[in-house]
Regions:
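Positively charged n-region of N-terminal signal peptides that target proteins for export
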Residues: 1-4
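Short alpha-helix boundary/capping motifs
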Residues: 31, 72-73
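Active-site-adjacent substructure of cysteine-protease-like catalytic cores
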Residues: 64, 71, 80-136, 140
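Noncatalytic regulatory segments and standalone regulatory/sensor domains
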Residues: 126-187
Length: 187
């Protein structure tokens, strides 16, 4: 019996897992600022985008406090102004699927399952047929491009994106030369 206890003790002492086990919920929420209010997806998406681009970590309340009005039916223009106030160069565009395919940085997009309720998420275009989606309401997930296009560019006329020019020196490969043509704010 003594030998069994010694072996059991040694087994317990030396069987330390070198990794942390995470739940599906933890994995899904990793890297995503979740929205705390029904219509605060814009603020949470901006915080998520900035956290992906910078070492500084923003919260949803940091962004909401910079907004000039409440979070009800926030527009790309208001999100752009908040980003500008925080010192980030940005511009909104309506772009085609072909242009979207060339993007390799996180961008904020407006998606619509129901035209009455637009929703803002952050997406990263991946090589192949998939897109990483950082949704303030649901969390992080992978979507096929066809599924994404069905809620971003339903009519094949182009979808709306807000492109933020990274200023972090750790991401020089993602520095963009934003086009000088008309943005959606110039209409």
């Amino acid at each position: 019996m003594e030998k069994i206890l010694i072996i059991l003790f040694i087994a317990i002492v030396y069987t330390h897992a070198g990794f942390a086990v995470k739940s599906y919920r933890e994995i899904r929420n990793e890297g995503v600022v979740r929205q705390n209010y029904e219509e605060s997806c814009g603020a949470a998406a901006v915080a998520t985008l900035l956290n992906l681009l910078d070492m500084h970590q923003f919260s949803e309340s940091d962004i909401v406090s910079k907004m000039s009005s409440n979070t009800n039916m926030v527009s790309f223009l208001e999100l752009s102004k908040v980003l500008h106030d925080l010192g980030w160069e940005n511009k909104g565009y309506q772009i085609s699927r072909e242009v979207f395919e060339k993007l390799n940085i996180p961008v904020l997009v407006k998606i619509q399952n129901d035209p009455r309720y637009p929703h803002f998420v952050v997406v990263i275009n991946q090589i192949g047929d998939f897109i990483s989606v950082f949704d303030p309401n649901f969390g992080k997930y992978i979507s096929s491009k066809d599924e994404f296009y069905s809620i971003w560019d339903k009519d094949n006329l182009g979808g709306y994106v807000l492109i933020v020019n990274p200023k972090n020196k750790f991401m020089p490969s993602h520095k963009l030369n934003l086009p000088t043509n008309k943005s959606i704010f110039d209409k």
